[in-house]
Amino acid sequence: MSKTLYQKIYDSHVVYKDKSNMSILYIDLHLIHEVTSPQAFDSLRHKKRGVRQPQKTFATMDHNVSTQSKNINASGSMAQKQMEQLIKNCNEFNISLYDVNNPNQGIVHVIAPEKGMTLPGMTIVCGDSHTSTHGAFGALSFGIGTSEVEHVLATQTLKQKRFKNMKITIIGKVPEFITAKDIILFIIGQLGSSRGTGYVIEFFGDVINNMSMEERMTLCNMAIEMGAKSGLIAPDEITYSYLKNKIYSPYGIFWKKAIDYWSTLKSDKNAYFDKFFTIDISNLAPQITWGTNPDQVISIDEKIPNHNKFDSSIIRDSIKSACKYMGLKEGTYLTDVSVDKVFIGSCTNARIEDLRSASKILKNKKISKNVKAIVVPGSGSVKEQAEKEGLDKIFINAGFEWRLPGCSMCLGMNNDRLNFGERCASXSNRNFEGRQGRGGRTH
């Protein structure tokens, strides 16, 4: 029977299956951070349980950390307590922790791939919705809740139903200056933020085949913004090249065996997909969100839509509501709208290729004195590499602040945030109301 990549990985990890559509899956890698794990560890203590396989669990501090200093008190008392609790929990249960003083510390979805923890064919979970990032390697990866974090810690398994399969094929020649972020925003805009609900999305096409691993991670990172359980891309030579000689990657004779297995991780020719779409990006222009949902997105040369042009009352009301919150008028070009802050960072766009691309645009240029701009590398390793290449100097000379690794202004959980009414051009993945701070406006 022909299978999709998702079905192959799912089926190979089933340890128990009931008569319904539910199975217990073995989990290969469990990633944790300071925000969604404290209650899970407290519950383990209360029930007098241990962590079943601590060597398959890795922790980092990212959501709450200050990117201005390594002081865990800098982001407030709640953040301090969560980080102190993570240190305590990892010490007690013998879990590897990348804390703020570790040179490899960074955003969980940046450090796991760059260290080779993320491998094709794995099942990977984390108490974070953008765990779908790791699907770029052909790994079944998805976010889980705190009660599920506890279950994985205690059993190294997770109860999961089988999701449907969606195939998205991207065709056309990629226009100059168009990035993976533009492509995924365009797809979300075309298909909607709920089209992927109940599905695992696999991406296909020559556009995908020619993408670097960092571009593929951006694509899969935002599959969740379509409502999908996860995003997947089959591993290939680009994947193998990226993973070779990483700290946690197989080596020696195990490397060849790994390649032999990884080469089987692709959807069969006649595999059945419940839904499929073909997206042509030949004429794609740079994309930017104007509203409060990732599917409220337009090309940079388009106007904010007029609600009267839509038949659906839901869409009309959504446009009016979003414009009111964002302080925008329908029919406006976003190129005519000024911003207060600029943020380059997040698990979507804080890798070395992202920083190289941004630095090329900023070289020998200066930002407005009225704009505060920050660059936050996704990890200590990214920061170190960028500084070796002199990228930090380009950003600083342009007027940006060069920061320490962390989630930073992607979300208002640390001391990098928008003030009420401030507008930000952001490289992050969500433009929800208040995402970057109460009353903040995100593009």
Curated annotation (Swiss-Prot):
GO terms for molecular function: 3-isopropylmalate dehydratase activity; 4 iron, 4 sulfur cluster binding; metal ion binding. Gene3D superfamilies: Aconitase, domain 3. It catalyses: (2R,3S)-3-isopropylmalate = (2S)-2-isopropylmalate. Keywords: 4Fe-4S, Amino-acid biosynthesis, Branched-chain amino acid biosynthesis, Iron, Iron-sulfur, Leucine biosynthesis, Lyase, Metal-binding, Plasmid. [4Fe-4S] cluster binds at C347, C407, C410. Catalyzes the isomerization between 2-isopropylmalate and 3-isopropylmalate, via the formation of 2-isopropylmaleate. This is 3-isopropylmalate dehydratase large subunit. It comes from Buchnera aphidicola subsp. Uroleucon erigeronensis. The lineage of its organism: Bacteria, Pseudomonadati, Pseudomonadota, Gammaproteobacteria, Enterobacterales.
